[in-house]
Amino acid sequence: MSNNSKSPPNEQHQQQPHPPDVLVQLTESFQHFFQSLSPQYQSMTSLPSINKDSYTSVGSAPTTNNNSNSNSNSNSSNRSLNNSGSSNSGGGGSNSNKKVNNNNNNNNNNNNNNLQSPTQSQFPYHYQYSSKALHDFEEKRKLLIEQLKSVKINLDTQCDDDPISFIKIRMELTKVKTSLETELKSLDELLHTTSEVEEPNPTPIDSITSLLTMIMPSSISNSVTNNTPSSATPLTLSNNNNYTSSSLATSPTTNSSSSSSSSSSSSSTHYYNSSISSNSLSSNLPPSSIPILNTSNNKNSYPNSIIPQGTPLDNPDPNLPRFPQRDHISVKLYVDCDDYFAASAQAIENATREVFITAWFLSPEVYLIRFPSLDERYRLDNLLKRKAMQGVKIFIILWDETKIATFKGSKRAKDKLEELHTNIKVIKHPPIIPIYWSHHQKTLIIDQEIAFVGGVDFCFGRFDTWCHHLIDVNSTLWKGKDYYNPILGDMGDILVPFEDSVDRKKIPRMPWHDVMAGVNGLAARDVALNFILRWNHHKDDYYPQLYFDTTPLSPVGTSQCQLLRSMDEWSGGGRIERSIHTAYVQAIEDANHYIYIENQNFVSTHAPNVWNQISFEIVKRIKRAIRKKEVFRVFIVIPCQQDGKVEETQIKGLMHWQYSTIIRGENTIMKLLRRDCPDVDLTEYICFLSLRTHAFLEGTFVTEQIYVHSKLMIVDDRTIIVGSANINDRSLIGERDSELAFIIRDEIDTIQTKMNGQDYIASRLVFNFRLRLWKEHLGLLPQINYPPHDQINNDINNIVNLNNNNNSNINNNINNNNNEINNNNNNNNNNNSNEINNNNSDGILNNSNSFHHGSVSDNLPPLNPSSNLNSSNKKLPTTTTAAAAATTTTTTTTTTTTTNGTGTTNKQKTSHHRSNSFQGLVLQSPGSNRSNLSSPQDSPQDSPRLKNLAEEISPPPTEQHQHQSPITDINLILENVDTIIHSNEQLPPPPSSTTPPPPPPPLTTTDSVIIEDYKSDGGNLNIENNNSNNTILTNAATSMNNSTSSLSSTSLPTTTTTTTAQQQQQQQQQQQQQQQQQQQQQQQQQQQQQQQQQQQPSQQQQQQQQQLSQQQQLQIKKKRSSISPSTSSNKLLLSGNGSGDSIRVVTDSGSSPRGQPRSMSSLHDHADSSYCQKSNIDLIDPTCSDFYFGVWIATAASNTRIYDTVFPAIPKNSIKTCEQFAQLQKIPVSLADSKLLSEVRGNLVFHPLDFLEGEDLQPSFLFTDDLFQ
């Protein structure tokens, strides 16, 4: 370097006095010294920068870096102070570097050099870290060596029977081996150690796998281990030229470490403190490595990353969510696929711009609407094609399944959907690797303004109602592969979707229980952004780029939602994230009263080598409750067995890890609690449950588990976590399966309830969601008798009598649930059964027996969409209940009086259970002691609009107990046949011989009826069916709800109707006619009572009436199938005449159907109150001993005993081996024992914790444990 380059610093030094130079060098020396000792010093306020040209060589390379950024770690590592010992600095510059000042003597030179401290690059590595950190690094180095040995064993023992599978697996193993070796090399350099690992035996195929590995994009994540050392901040090893591109970063795990994060991420970390904070993380969380950072150009970026830097998505902490908490969100929760499919059908139907779908498994031929028949217009492929033809862009991401493990037909689904229209684009991902992990997200996004997240795929085997029917011999609801039972038979060839895979007359289907959440506003935008990031990461040049919608949205709801993910670079193109696990841990730690979990799997840290801490936190919270003598409950609902045959290897593996978490092992949940708390009854604190049901199929009883596929957790009636993540490492570790979930709270819309006997303020949304789930499990919801069952299916005692040839009294006992149509058509003669079972008395006709709280129902899990989406206002589909309960204020118990053959009368109390023998546990009578579940403004009778409507449509009080006669014409039914409801349970029971019939529901006149179009907002739906002498009344009046929680940026106006003077006059005339007809009917009833005592109707007359009823139903079905879409105007044109006809809606829906899609569940009313009148069960307090032991535990114990007694070959504690299980499958069901099934209540059973206890369930092959964890 020339002398001119050295003269400016020398001249500057001569002009300054000597002491200031010494102070400057002292200041810089201390600064460098502290920086070398503390990496966290980067985030502190540094000392003022000094011009280093005055005492360092101008020609030194690090000078530019120092001037550009004096506070970064890379600068401190690259900064080099020249001293007399730096003889290797290179070339002629070494002599000039030794001269700081030509006018100073040698002693001054030495003194100045002694004041310059060594830099971080000149410090030995073992001085830069604490002893604990070095110990952790050493432990990790040993662990990496063991993992490399395991990889070698797997490479050497790999079977080459299948060349394609051999290459795929070897590529994956080679990739893992390379990643482990890179990390081990970094640790060796840090610790100054030498690690030697034996290389695997070479094979001829290694050259091919190496070439493919170089071509295929590799995952950024460098950690395949679950237990790695912790560190406070990411430690970048870039201190010399050999490691400028390598780094080692670990995630914060302790309270102290999380508070000392680096300054580069402090702003984004603080962004989440109001929602999910790392300060609440358990100190027992084993850390895991985060992806390697690319530190080139002093920027923390990822190669090919699509995550914008400087945003919350770029947060380096994998435990924190990338998306912020969103306030004022409207949330709808859907239980079982019947409700969700109807809501999704309406949402897609009303899409105007875009539809995004992600799926683990997708069947284009799945039917979304199945009542009153399988609707071809709402088959998924037809619906998507129709919307694509209307100009809507449809983008779908499917998991490209591993062919060696499963076959879900993703290629067929992609080809079929893309053939429908050019506006449908489908991506399969990943192309080859990773082999073991999957895309497990299940989402539906409409116009980036409404989103659904949960565990439901649009595929076969998912559709179900809350009754979970087992049989469908006539393919009424489940067609072809949709009738599915993987436990007793395979799905078969998925390429032939409408061929049955099992024999419907011998094998029951496996019911499916699942949950979805719908959100709007910014929460939906977050789900859309997740999809867009994934799409842009997965796509190739053929597919278009997607863009995020930034249009402002107005908040309309009351809930707080935060999007959680399990993602990695391979699955989403960004940094690793496992915020779902963080949310679960924090919610469990913060629980005060109870935890309710439904999940497909339960594999956690109490099983060997499992990382996630869910079970650890549960045990810790239970121990705390025991120590403080608190009342604390943990409900865990999981499947009885996995969806497969128990002899299959993968099913055994799943069972092994689940049992290793719960009970089989010294450190399992139950063994640990029993050992640490030997004097405590653990049933008071934790219970493991499953769901099961039964049916009568072709002369024998069958049973099957209700497969729990939901992934949710409810805490203290205030917090919900719902999504697609199972409780296992696959879903929670972040590096494996891609998952999505929401954590939902609502601190604005609250309700006064009870908790452990004390007054408690709960979230109305969460409280009602729990009620909906528990009513289903306890059997407190009305029966949905569709598809219709055989006549004897619902009366077990009569089936036993039939087999004993006791035919003399059959007609006095047979259940007539499915013959009510015949009874109603033959009121004068038909007395086929004198003992009427009113299992369905909770249905839509008997609404006087249920509580109704208008505001509560608005926040219950919606059962069917009634409000619709349009281009300017987006609303999540809400429920349309089928009862006019808003006008009902009485809650008396209804009894049905029957007449036996001797003429005496017997009163039989109605029940909500499968049989009428169980009358419920009387825990608490409805009185003042029960808490008030609704404020005055919540009650429907306090709504002025509903009061006026009730006054208009309700008959006089004196007529309440008189049977109403028909006033409508059959033509009205045929005109409005799209929405008619003709299920058997909706028909009123025949009049009794000794007592007047039960009071009918309030009537509404046809003048106030609106047949809503799918683009309008909620309304009334009343249809009357003139069937000889009886009336079918269906009231789906969602406009009676005084507040509807809508998922929209702008609420749609509520459609109302005004009654003109002429209409009122017509209504009065109709009421007068009704009174006259009622008087005539009373006379007919008296005559009927006399005839009943004299003679019984002949079988020939009964058959004639039955044929007549069937002909009328066929006529209605033909009329329904002949209706075609209307093609007039885009606007609603209300037209009516003065004759009292119903108001008609004429729309221009193009190729879209005229009516809105409906679910079967929406046609049945379920009380919104926690108190169930029929059974005297109150669900308000989930922790009180009366409910917990008297109802919950007692129901599970009773059902478990009954099922274990009746059915020999089901998962139960007495079966210890697979051989024993196979032998018991050959034993038929005893009809004598089947009488016990009449006592089954709901579908709760205890999980068989000792099932196959004597069987070795652990998989025998290596390197596959993480598949099941």
From Swiss-Prot:
Q: Give the record's family classification.
A: Belongs to the phospholipase D family.
EC number(s) on record? 3.1.4.4
Please list where the region (Disordered) is annotated.
55-121, 222-269, 300-320, 810-966, 983-1007, 1116-1167
Q: How is its activity regulated?
A: Inhibited by butan-1-ol.
PROSITE patterns found in the cross-reference section: PLD
Coiled-coil ranges per UniProt: 131-192, 803-835, 1059-1096
Record's compositionally biased regions (Pro residues): 987-1003
Pfam families per record: PLDc, PLDc_2
Report the catalytic activity.
a 1,2-diacyl-sn-glycero-3-phosphocholine + H2O = a 1,2-diacyl-sn-glycero-3-phosphate + choline + H(+)
- Sorted alphabetically, which keywords does the UniProt record give? Coiled coil, Hydrolase, Lipid degradation, Lipid metabolism, Repeat
Protein's job: Plays a role in cell growth. Hydrolyzes membrane phospholipids, such as PtdCho free headgroup and PtdOH (phosphatidic acid; signaling molecule on its own). Involved in the inhibition of actin-based motility and endocytosis. Its inhibition causes complete collapse of F-actin organization.
| Gene Ontology BP, a term | phospholipid catabolic process
Q: What's the name of the protein? A: Phospholipase D A
Compositional bias, Low complexity, is annotated for 65-87, 95-114, 233-269, 810-850, 859-906, 934-943, 1122-1142
